[in-house]
Amino acid sequence: MDSSAEGSGNGGSKTAERTVKSMNVYKKDTMKNLVKDNSYVGRGIVIGKTEDGTKAAVAYFIMGRSENSRNRIFKEEGEDVMIYPFDASKVEDPSLIIYAPIRKLDGKLIVTNGDQTDTIRDFVVAGKSFEDALETREFEPDAPNWTPRISGMLTFADGDFTYKMSILKSADEAGTACNRFTYSYKAIAGVGHFLHTYMGDGSPLPTFTGEPERASIPNDIDAWTKEIWENLNEQNKISIYVRFTDLKTGAVENRMINKNV
């Protein structure tokens, strides 16, 4: 490189260094701040460990803009959660709104935004992996949005847990290929990761980009449920489900809110 080229780029390099130094890659934010300014987060998964390190925390919520999307409620079925129509007479397309977002297996908890929950369950039961299961699935066929499939799985062992998260999204505007991203985490007290389908409202809807966002996980399940629910867009939010699992005893606490009651 000649000296003139090196000198001309020096100022930009120093600016870039200052920018990088000012960034905190370990910063986490409250769920309030992560959702309050986004009118359409879509569907969201949060997984992490409470601040005191004693519980695994999972949250799943759904939002909707159309009458078909908003016509949904969460229902508990044993240790699983199902999504059903609130008014069956108004169902237009049941394929993308009726599914089990949460399923419990021995030593594992699966949470997703679609029927890939059952794909993951079936593969795990057969001795295969989270990644193997999702290699068989793609983003949703709802052109032009190509809504990504987001998934998570907690694995409990020795009084602690690890977790994986995945997003399957379209490689281009035409939906010609699927890009698959998987993230693997060791649980850290007070830290969670938040993965959601959309960056905001739009036409088409802008797909989530980047890594799962780092979120704070408090000790109080009621406070955390309220924090997320009250800061989701009032017009578009539909339901939320939160589960805390005690890492020593396995005891479970659940909170569920349905806008349709």
Residue ranges and their predicted role:
Residues 1-22:
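N-terminal amphipathic/basic-hydrophobic helices that include classical n-h-c signal peptides
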